[in-house]
């Protein structure tokens, strides 16, 4: 059992954290991206499947490849962000299960079941994307998650000939707080939750 984290940590992760669309001209070091992944990879997934794959797009060439895949409303903010993470999932993730979940033959649970593979890969890579957002905030980065892009075009540009498929995008960097709008409302407990 662990003690609750303090209010400052909760503020960093949740109550004071914001979704950013404008970015300061400050690079994110590759070493920080490696540190970020070291935290993300420890988050739980079903049968420790870890199906998410992350492409950290931070070069001009990478952004040029990404740009045609973006919806119009996401183009400028993504090109301005120091890093855009393509959160993908690997449909061959069952092949890693003998290594990642060695105490059971979990790979056999997915044999011949492509729909189950895709369902679990999408669900658990989405979970890992959430870990990435929280880990990034904990490391002093700001985030701007997005789903406005052409998945087929992105997969063709970045993942042709592989078993990887795109799930969502997350812009990373140091947000320009002066460009933030007022926080949007969220649903209260009694409208979003049921005690059963």
Curated annotation (Swiss-Prot):
Enzyme Commission designation: 1.-.-.-
Gene Ontology molecular function terms on file: oxidoreductase activity
Top enzyme class: oxidoreductase
Organism: Stutzerimonas stutzeri (strain A1501) (Pseudomonas stutzeri)
Keywords, sorted A to Z: Flavoprotein, FMN, NAD, NADP, Oxidoreductase
InterPro entries: Nitroreductase, Nitroreductase-like, Nitroreductase_HadB/RutE, RutE-like
Family matches, as SUPFAM superfamilies: FMN-dependent nitroreductase-like (SSF55469)
Entry keyword Transferase: no
Highest taxon above the source species: Bacteria
PANTHER family listed in its UniProt record: MALONIC SEMIALDEHYDE REDUCTASE RUTE-RELATED
Gene3D superfamilies registered for this protein in UniProt: NADH Oxidase
Protein name as annotated: Putative NADH dehydrogenase/NAD(P)H nitroreductase PST_3601
Keyword Cell division: no
């Amino acid at each position: 059992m662990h003690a609750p984290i303090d209010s400052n940590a909760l503020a960093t992760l949740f109550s004071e954290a914001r979704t950013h669309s404008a970015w300061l001209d400050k690079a994110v070091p590759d070493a920080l991206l490696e540190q970020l992944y070291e935290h993300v990879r420890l988050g739980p997934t079903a049968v420790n499947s870890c199906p998410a794959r992350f492409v950290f797009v931070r070069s001009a060439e990478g952004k040029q490849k990404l740009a045609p895949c973006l919806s119009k409303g996401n183009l400028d903010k993504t090109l301005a962000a120091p890093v855009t993470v393509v959160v993908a999932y690997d449909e061959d993730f069952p092949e890693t299960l003998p290594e990642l979940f060695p105490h059971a033959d979990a790979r056999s649970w997915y044999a011949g079941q492509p729909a189950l593979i895709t369902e679990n890969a999408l669900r658990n890579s989405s979970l890992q994307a959430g870990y990435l957002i929280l880990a990034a905030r904990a490391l002093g980065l700001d985030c701007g998650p997005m789903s406005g892009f052409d998945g087929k075009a992105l997969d063709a540009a970045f993942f042709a000939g592989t078993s990887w498929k795109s799930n969502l995008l997350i812009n990373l960097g140091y947000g320009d707080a002066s460009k933030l709008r007022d926080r949007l409302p969220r649903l209260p407990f009694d409208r979003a939750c049921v005690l059963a």
